[in-house]
Amino acid sequence: MSIPQSKSSSNGFPLKRGETEEVLHKTNTSNTVFNGEAGSLKRLSLDRLVYFTTCKIGHHVEVHLRNGSVYTGIFHAANVEKDFGIILKMACLIKDGTLRGHKSRSEFVRKPPSKTFIIPADELVQVIAKDLSVSSNNMSNAVQGEKPSELLTDSSISQSYHVDRERQLQRWVPDETIPHGADLENVFDNPWNRKWNQFEVNKSLFGVKSTFDEDLYTTRLERGPQTKQLEEHAQKIAREIEAETTRDIHVAEERGLQLNENFDFDEEARYSSVRPVTGFGDSGFDLEDNALLDTCNDLTFGGSSTSDGQKPASSGKGCEELRVSGDSQSSRKNKNVDQSCSTSKQQSKDFPAAGSNISESQLDEQRRKNNEEVSHNNRSAEESTSGHGDIKEGAKSGGGASSVSKAVTEREREASQVSSKTKSESSFGQSASRSSESRPGPSTSSRPGLSPSSSIGSMASSEKSTLNPNAKEFKLNPKAKSFKPLQSAAAPPQSPIADASFYYPGPSHVPVQQMPGMPPVNYGLPPYPGNQPQMMYHPQAYYHPNGQPQYPQQQMIPGQQQQQMIPGQQHPRPVYYMHPPPYPQDMPYHNKGRE
């Protein structure tokens, strides 16, 4: 729609933004005076221009300027009193008329749009608005269509506003040319459609050469001797996943699973991604929910999880089985205790007492006898813990009580022998027997239905224990102070040098000096975590005992000089007086240097 040019005002844009919007909605102007027939025609054309301009407010328009530039934006306001200047919101330049060369539109789009853009009337050529509604009926329909509904489903979205809203969706029925069971996964693998290639069609029809590479979107398959095995393993995992139960309607539809008949749903609920509020019930999935929870409980805690109302009738039998398993476990523990006791006895017998003279043949024979006794005890323990039927029969018979009492007395006698022998054993034998005997046996008095062998084992293990029964329990005092031992006086350092006739250690009170000319230890280096040899310097020299005789540091007595003749030497050797160093009292080698 072309707009006639009008003369621009002297001051460019005289009215403000608010005044322009107010003038835009006026249909009659008080400043315009019409006289006669010409005035009435002018007024009619102005009213029509104002009406069309008002209809453009809020619409996307395209504005052409005198220099050839084109702007797009939202029509916001216009000045219809004097000139026809307009204002655009979010204006973008799509064509620049000042440039001679052609410039692509994408380069202008990259620039950020102007929030408010004013176009004067002297630069305006035309304003183009597409799909503009000028009738009242169309405007009312458009306003009603802009009202958003609370919930939009596929059926409401697909329906038009000009038709009935109760239209039902139609089921799609494939044509006869499409085979049965065709889906998106195998549609290109079918022989009837195998010749179709998307990239070849695009190249032949549109001349577009595709650079598609499936390795960019999927995992690259390494072809090799193990490819077939990997494919079979992947197919096995896929079958296991597809065989699992699901509560998702769409997943069940994809896998071809039959849903519960009690579940009421329509085509929209089956294929739509929008779940409506009404008409969707999951009452048919109550049993499946319970089964799913039971399965999860079985996987998490183990065993069979049943509700209170579905307890099996053989609950008493289950209790009996649990009791039997508990008895068998206790008997196994007591059997292990007996074996540990017998092992400790064997170790104590294998190591004779200190001071006894036993030959190797006698020691081997004693070990062989101990092994036979251990194997015999193990067999008897296995027979006693083989089952409840044997225990009950032995208890009913007359000799059962006597056999049990004999076994108890025999165990007591063996325990007393072991305790008497351990007093004269070696340290290794004592540690081995005490470590095995000090293990506390499991408490089986609180469990019902225990076997006699288990009670005997517990009695024997309790009698063999060397713990003090009258000892009191140790309780930690939270108010007690921490114990700090007193630092005793440092012992005098022992000389690491061998004792010799000419070695004189320095006095104990003289501090150790650093070797001259040597840098301090760890200078400029991190400390070494291990033991480091200390480099010390002592004023006293060390003389090797087997070397040439040397003389210690001597001091000349002023005014005294003696000579001593040694046989075999021509020159006399001077004798000097030497001050004796103060030796500490604890040194075992003091006075040895002057002998």
UniProtKB/Swiss-Prot annotation:
Q: Motif range for PAM2-like 1?
A: 466-474
Q: Motif PAM2-like 2 located where? A: 475-485
Q: Where is the composition biased (Basic and acidic residues)?
A: 364-382
Q: In which tissues is it expressed?
A: Expressed in cauline leaves, stems, rosette leaves, immature siliques and primary inflorescences.
Q: Which UniProt keywords apply?
A: Repeat
Region (Disordered) residue ranges read 302-505, 536-595
**Stored PROSITE patterns:** SM (PS52002)
Any idea where the Sm domain is? Answer: 48-113
Q: Where is the composition biased (Polar residues)?
A: 302-313, 326-346
Q: Which InterPro entries match?
A: ATXN2-like, LsmAD_domain, PAM2_motif, Sm, SM_dom_ATX
- Keyword flag Secreted: no
Q: Where is the composition biased (Low complexity)?
A: 416-465, 488-501, 548-570
GO terms, molecular function: mRNA binding
PANTHER family xrefs: ATAXIN 2-RELATED, POLYADENYLATE-BINDING PROTEIN-INTERACTING PROTEIN 4
Question: What is recorded about the protein's domains?
Answer: Contains a tandem repeat of a PAM2-like motif, which seems to be involved in the binding to the PABC/CTC domain of PAB proteins.
Q: What is this protein called?
A: Polyadenylate-binding protein-interacting protein 4
